[in-house]
């Protein structure tokens, strides 16, 4: 009886006769009386395959592999009553066409789990990488089809992000430095109206901000239980303003109210007071 050479993996191994199931390949076991059938159309059912292969021998079982959704993966297995019927199909595999479509027929091999690095396996000559009609890839080498289960890699969840709060800083000096703008408000009197002019320097500069000696209150930052930062309420501090002077005109007095923040220094809020007319009598 003519024997075929089997190769259960891309690595070359010694030929194994099909009529001797005890001489199994190195990395798999030949299932007796069973053949592998690939290239099956997804419309083909098990009854159609049984009817087709029954003309070549006594068919015991037909199994088409489906996915979880019940859709055919494009390959299956046919088990015959005797090994001779299975051997006959393998010898005529190149001549078998089902509905004008060539079938990939080979021995059924149960693969064994071996610890071989995938990178060390080099594909041999004559190896074909095929895809079923439903998109499942497999390797066809020396009449044997190999289906590789895709490796599932678990992605670790990202570390939860936490906000880092800085410790409260107590400043007792009346002069402090902070990346902020230097605001200077001046009042100019024009006939018939008031005009406020607030010049601003370029944003790249970070000059000192000089305040009059006054009480500066800082509140520490509270840390929430979830690791976030709870900003404290803004504390307002009022600077002293020079005494109003008398002139042959009208001068408006105002207070500059500052709202310090942990990020930037906002613009001063101008609160003009009611206009006071100062009369001076010269003798």
Swiss-Prot record:
It comes from the Eukaryota. It is found in: Cytoplasm. GO terms for cellular component: cytoplasm. It holds the Pfam family RRM_1. Residues 160-184 form the DAZ domain. GO terms for biological process: 3'-UTR-mediated mRNA stabilization; cell differentiation; positive regulation of translational initiation; spermatogenesis. Residues 1-25 are annotated as: Disordered. The keyword Ribonucleoprotein does not apply. Residues 33-110 form the RRM domain. InterPro entries: DAZ_dom (IPR043628), Nucleotide-bd_a/b_plait_sf (IPR012677), RBD_domain_sf (IPR035979), RRM_dom (IPR000504). The keyword RNA-binding applies. GO terms for molecular function: mRNA 3'-UTR binding; translation activator activity. Keywords: Cytoplasm, Developmental protein, Differentiation, RNA-binding, Spermatogenesis, Translation regulation. Its main location: cytoplasm. Interacts with DAZ1 and DAZL. Probable RNA-binding protein, which may be required during spermatogenesis. May act by binding to the 3'-UTR of mRNAs and regulating their translation. PANTHER family: BOULE-RELATED, PROTEIN BOULE-LIKE. Belongs to the RRM DAZ family. This is Protein boule-like.
């Amino acid at each position: 009886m003519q024997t075929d050479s089997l190769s259960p993996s891309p690595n070359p191994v010694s030929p194994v006769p099909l009529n001797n199931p005890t001489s199994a390949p190195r990395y798999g076991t030949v299932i007796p009386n069973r053949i592998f059938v690939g290239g099956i159309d997804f419309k083909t059912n098990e009854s159609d395959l049984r009817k087709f292969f029954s003309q070549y021998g006594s068919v015991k079982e037909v199994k088409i592999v489906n996915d979880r959704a019940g859709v055919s993966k494009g390959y299956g297995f046919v088990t015959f009553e005797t090994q001779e019927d299975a051997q006959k199909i393998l010898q005529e595999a190149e001549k078998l066409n089902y509905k004008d479509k060539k079938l990939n027929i080979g021995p059924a091999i149960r693969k064994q789990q071996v610890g071989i690095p995938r990178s060390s396996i080099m594909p041999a000559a004559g190896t074909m990488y095929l895809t079923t009609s439903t998109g499942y890839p497999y390797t066809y080498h020396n009449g044997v089809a190999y289906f590789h289960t895709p490796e599932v890699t678990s992605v670790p969840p990202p570390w939860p992000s936490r906000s880092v709060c800085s410790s409260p800083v107590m400043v007792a000096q009346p002069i402090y430095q902070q990346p902020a703008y230097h605001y200077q408000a001046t009042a100019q009197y024009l006939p018939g109206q008031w005009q406020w002019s607030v010049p601003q320097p370029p944003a790249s500069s970070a000059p000192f901000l000089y305040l009059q000696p006054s009480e500066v209150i800082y509140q520490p930052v509270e840390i929430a239980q979830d690791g976030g930062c709870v900003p404290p309420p803004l504390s307002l501090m009022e600077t002293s303003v020079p005494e109003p002077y008398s002139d042959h005109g009208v001068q408006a007095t105002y207070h500059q109210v500052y709202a310090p923040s942990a990020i930037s220094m906002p613009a001063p809020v101008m609160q003009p007071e009611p206009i006071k007319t100062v009369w001076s009598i010269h003798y």
